[in-house]
Amino acid sequence: MSFPQLGYPQYLTAGQAAVYGGERPGVLAAAAAAAAAAAAAGSGRPTGAELGSSSTAAVTSVLGMYASPYSAPNYSAFLPYTTDLTLFSQMGSQYELKDNPGVHPATFAAHTTPGYYPYGQFQYGDPGRPKNATRESTGTLKAWLNEHRKNPYPTKGEKIMLAIITKMTLTQVSTWFANARRRLKKENKVTWGARSKEDDNIFGSDNEGDHEKNEDDEEIDLESIDIDKIDDNDGEQSNEEEDEKLEHLRQGEKESLKKESEVMIPSSDGLKPKDSMSLGKESSDTSNTRIVSPGGQGNIQVPPHSKPKIWSLAETATSPDGALKSSPPPSQGNHTSPPIQHPAFLPSHGLYTCQIGKFHNWTNGAFLTQSSLINMRSLLGVNPHHAAHHNHHHLQAHQQAPFLATNLSSLSSDKTPERTSPKHSDRENVPRTDSPPQLKPSFQAVRENTLSQQEGTSRILTALPSA
């Protein structure tokens, strides 16, 4: 029996029945029952002789669909449609196999399912799929750009409309317009004004303020746009750091100039302290200045109009020794001294003293020499010539006393310096090692003026320098 609707007009032979009959009895029985029902439906007269032949023919016809590797190992029990062969007789008349397009052979017409053909409408023609920018799609964009050359900034609504027409995405449309604006600027050097506010209020634009930005000459590539932004930011940060460094250097230079200008150079009167003014009678010349040093080194001439040097090694090397030594602690707090300044900060025409703490050190005889003591006043403002004249009156009073009272006169002469200078009474008992050799030549003139023939006067004079 044949099945023309399946396309396999095969007939069962005795040898095939003997081969497949003994191995799968259960499957053959089920297949025989199904084949008998199909034969009864087709002929309408089922007979007992036809039942056996129809069952074997149904199995062999189904197995004929497969090649020899499937039929040789006897996979008939695993075929899915062996028990449902009655369906094919009813479905065969519903399909018109003559109009089959020919992609598949006619033998598979019963098993065909609705499939998508390559390059069809639904698979590759989906409008939601992004499309590459072609000349046809960009032609619409070029036409819009030519119409809006004065203001080539489409609003968001216009971009959506152009994206629908050209089947492109909004990002592609925006990038195309950005590149087109760069090309126009490069070719024609055209600059555009501000956008109209009405379009922005209605639709809004994602390119607001593009005309204010400095656009690069190169076009934007969507793949490397993030990397380009990072590189630009790094370049801007490096430029900003260099600018900040330059600003810090300039500010430091300005501050140093301000500090130099703040170092005030006072006038010669302002530099002269009150104590040094009383000592400066000998400085009659205004061009040259004598620096009085207590170390007995004499007077040092300073050249006029010497420019001050800030922290100069040569200036510190040539400065007096007293300037490098620290001042001794003051014993009396009644007298004040001018503020100590470095010699480099002082002008050339000012009189300044050596850096020895208080003024009472100048009255100490241990630090004075013969040249410096003559022109200086004592702490009480008494000139040495006046002191010699005062001592002369005391000596005349003591000369009237007999020689037996020489000891008493020496005691009275010890009390007179206590009356004139009571603050120096505590210095009589202090031993001085350097004062006797330095004080003898300074009082030599006083001794010659008041010389007498009596021995008591010499004793009185020896007691006077101790005061």
Swiss-Prot record:
A cellular component annotation (GO) from this entry: nucleus
GO biological process: brain development; cell development; cell fate specification; dorsal/ventral pattern formation; ectodermal placode development; maintenance of kidney identity; mesoderm development; midbrain-hindbrain boundary development
Known DNA-binding region: 126-188
Induction of its expression: By wnt signaling. Mutually antagonizes bmp4 signaling. Inhibited in the neural plate by foxd5. The anterior limit of expression at the future border between the prethalamus and thalamus is defined by mutual repression with the anterior repressor fezf2, and also by arx. Induced by retinoic acid (RA) during kidney development.
InterPro entries attached to this UniProt entry: HD, Homeobox_CS, Homeodomain-like_sf, Iroquois_homeo, KN_HD
Functional summary from the UniProt entry: Acts partially redundantly with other irx members in neural patterning. Required for formation of the posterior forebrain, midbrain, hindbrain, and to a lesser extent, spinal cord. Acts early in neural plate development to induce expression of some but not all proneural genes, and specify a neural precursor state. Also up-regulates repressors that prevent neuronal differentiation. Patterns the neuroectoderm in both the anterior/posterior and dorsal/ventral axes.
UniProt protein name: Iroquois-class homeodomain protein irx-1-A
Taxonomic source organism: Xenopus laevis
